[in-house]
């Protein structure tokens, strides 16, 4: 208490507030959406696909903010679908110009080869989940790897600055 009285309560509060924000993880809100299970799923909308036209996407991810600082990042994920299970996987893009490795027969990304950094898996409609990971600076891709969803455009770019 002597230290607080010497510094003044206002100064002590500023120091405490500054200290707590240094240790806090960046928080990212992720909404997983689609236009309904009865909507036809287009293909050819995977990241870095030639002639990519995202206006055809019937599902996707809304990410806010899309840029954070390196360190601990907490993703708060909500499946806003009314009838479809979705997930969110964090992938590091070693080369942002290259597509992720894909298993055609399974209609999904090869998570082991792609550099999976963590996931909130299989969220039922209306459900939420969270994931906290330590991310280094670079480009990342958030994807839903339920078969067919990634190829239908269910992904979002994400940047981590130094």
Describe every region a protein language model picked out.
Residues 26-27, 63-92, 129-143:
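Beta-strand cores of secreted/periplasmic/IMS beta-sandwich domains, seen most often
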Residues 25-72:
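N-terminal edge beta-strand
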Residues 8-18:
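Bacterial N-terminal signal peptides
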Residues 58-59, 68, 113-114, 124-126, ...:
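Short solvent-exposed loop/turn micro-motifs enriched in small/polar/acidic residues
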Residues 1-9:
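Bacterial N-terminal signal peptides that target proteins for export
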Residues 86-122:
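The feature marks short-to-medium sequence segments in extracytoplasmic or secretory-pathway proteins
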Residues 29, 34-36, 82-83, 118-162:
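Extracellular/periplasmic metallocenter environments
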